């Protein structure tokens, strides 16, 4: 339990003891503690006096006064109490309790903020999963940044997280990739008789693959068409996936599993789920096609599994894949989908229900569109290539840290304008620079302290920490673990970037209000330990969203 929860629990216990002592109720109702919107109204407030009105048959302000009169303020860490309005009780805490967070942060280091107990739940988090047919773009970048941050947050909150990338290496798009490579392969050999398929891939990378294969494996030209296309499928996917993996690794995004769609066919899992759905009576034949009764589970219409030409729709292997996720022992399935996949939510949930799996175990987040902005105008095409701007170009333009930070600053269900000019600015207007500068500034102060012979663990008396800005800063440090818990519960990576901005802001305010290194050696020791706790918190929070914490800038 974190220090904030401990204090709130103690306050609730002492209020309950006070109610008993005052004889206000035989059975005490639920005591709710809230943080007032206006800090002038205290650190915490409760409406328990009004809740007790009917039970105690007294005026709520009288009840509030009785609670106050019988409260053990020392145990509750309370230095002042006000009764406001019809009977709200506002508590102002003795903030020395907050200083306990300083040695805790220093002792835990990289683990500070992480919960100690496992949730005992396995989470499979699938994100990015871009088709291996071209470069990653800004939409994939947002998916990668949010997905990786969410995996870090859930892990810190005590979940057992598996990060997974689903490789769409089967289906029409891979056939089109193979046909496109075939055309470029023969062109490189001087044979222009092979035309590009209607839905082919015309990117520069396909030309390069064709040339490379023509140089290294010219013998492929003598293969049968079937064998040739099989080879181009395999080599094309390998080439594209190697490039995607390299870009994602540079973007500080890593996966535990790379799950191949082809493996579902090789292990006959698609046939298995199809047979199971038929056995359960959820499929039917109509218009020469095989349908799934998803309307039985709140979908707006039934869905085709097998088309009238005998080929599978994309939906059927998707069902097999998600059923495989369940079979692997995962309690929670989280998918991060692009904005064009909104219609998939109900049908995927319905498909799980056909197997008796609670569809609430599947959570789907839709990543809304990102616009790249420069000088107030949208940038759609790369000036260098004339094509859509790739993740690699974004990394080259603004850097990994800025890209990761900016792409996790907003809720994924909201559209976002990525200001590339702002992301490159070395000023406090740039959110990531502002946060990293706070960390670098702390490192600079700690270096000066060390030169004066003051170590971060030297303090054992924190009573000298009385400055209002210092207290507010410590409150923010103490709020780190609850913020992680909240971000995990709501699957909201942007709660961490919001927290980082607040923490950096509180540090800068403290720094501008009071000197850290002073002639008062005991006060200096306390301040040095405090800012080390802030530094650890800031570094851990930045790491959670995949951003570095530089020691100098």
UniProtKB/Swiss-Prot annotation:
Q: Name one Pfam family in it.
A: Arg_tRNA_synt_N
Q: Where is this motif: 'HIGH' region?
A: 130-140
Gene Ontology CC terms, in alphabetical order: cytoplasm
Q: What is its EC number?
A: 6.1.1.19
Which top-rank group of organisms is this from?
A: Bacteria
Its chief place of residence is cytoplasm
Where is this gene product found? Cytoplasm
Q: Which UniProt keywords apply?
A: Aminoacyl-tRNA synthetase, ATP-binding, Cytoplasm, Ligase, Nucleotide-binding, Protein biosynthesis
Q: Name one GO biological process term.
A: arginyl-tRNA aminoacylation
List, in alphabetical order, the Gene Ontology terms for molecular function in this entry: arginine-tRNA ligase activity; ATP binding
Q: How does it assemble?
A: Monomer.
Q: Family, per the entry?
A: Belongs to the class-I aminoacyl-tRNA synthetase family.
This chain's protein is named: Arginine--tRNA ligase
